[in-house]
């Protein structure tokens, strides 16, 4: 049995993106030693059959924490916000688990190695958007002279998810941890604490984003160990990339222009790319030229 596993989840709407993620992984020789397992949250039978030829295992995602039906509606894919906190229960026997959202793809295997290395010794390996390329991480509403109200994603989500004012303030100014890509060992203490915090978030707040604020609380309030990886290990700022034409790869915008590890097409700003594989994005090359290139994975 393979020791480590990469997991993702999709419904039928994200089937094509999931396929691209899998292909982006399997093109690397190193992937032969890594299992790939998929959680099904609304895939069609023919899609499951197609995926089964590429991956090690496919299982139906469940509502591992009970959620009121009015919060779910017809969005079964929201199971991704819950089931990722329980993946060792779905796919047992692995030493290390690496979750990658279906709307991401692997550009460099270095990122995979960093995630598996980073989670050793019972730590969470995860990236944050607090990076020089991303600009501001907080917003301020200026009230009078030097007085302002600080707007924080962590604070907002913590309050809307029912966490106390004390906890919301504890996480407010900390770098926001992006749970779209993360790695944990099977015996890491984070799983149980994360599940506890997730249950509280789901009880009071929306399903969307609940797993992310729950993990931020787990790290910054419960003080569980973390290895924060560079932003290029989960790059979501798709409009600020450069292209290295010599090496034929995407790189960070600023020097030393490190190769992007995982391209993550998350957020409304990237809808046009997620929903249109043929969309051409303008990219600056390392030579200062402007080229047009597709930013979906193309095998």
Residue ranges: model-predicted function:
Residues 1-299:
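Glycosyltransferase catalytic domains, chiefly GT-A lineage
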């Amino acid at each position: 049995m393979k020791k480590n596993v990469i997991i993702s989840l999709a419904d039928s709407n994200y089937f094509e993106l999931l396929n691209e993620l899998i292909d982006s992984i399997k093109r690397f020789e190193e992937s032969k030693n890594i299992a790939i397992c998929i959680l099904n949250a609304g895939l069609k039978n023919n899609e499951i059959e197609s995926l089964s030829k590429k991956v090690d295992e496919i299982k139906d995602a469940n509502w591992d924490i009970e959620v009121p039906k009015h919060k779910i509606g017809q969005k079964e894919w929201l199971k991704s916000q819950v089931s990722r906190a329980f993946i060792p229960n779905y796919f047992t026997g692995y030493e290390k688990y690496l979750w990658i959202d279906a709307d991401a793809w692997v550009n460099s295997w270095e990122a995979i190695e960093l995630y598996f290395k980073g989670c050793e010794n019972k730590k969470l390996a995860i990236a944050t958007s607090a990076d020089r390329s991303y600009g501001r991480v907080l917003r301020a509403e200026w009230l009078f002279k030097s007085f302002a109200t600080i707007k924080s994603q962590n604070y907002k989500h913590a309050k809307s998810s029912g966490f106390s004012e004390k906890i919301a303030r504890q996480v407010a100014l900390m770098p926001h941890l992006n749970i779209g890509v993360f790695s944990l060992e099977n015996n890491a203490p984070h799983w149980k604490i994360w599940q506890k915090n997730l249950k509280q978030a789901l009880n009071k707040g929306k399903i969307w984003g609940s797993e992310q604020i729950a993990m931020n609380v787990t790290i910054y309030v419960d003080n569980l160990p973390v290895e924060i990886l560079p932003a290029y290990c989960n790059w979501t700022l798709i409009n600020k990339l450069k292209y290295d034409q010599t090496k034929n790869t995407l790189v960070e915008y600023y020097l030393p222009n490190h190769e992007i590890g995982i391209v993550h097409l998350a957020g409304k700003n990237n809808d046009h790319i997620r929903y249109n594989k043929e969309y051409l994005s303008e990219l600056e090359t390392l030579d200062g030229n402007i080229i047009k290139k597709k930013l979906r994975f193309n095998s």
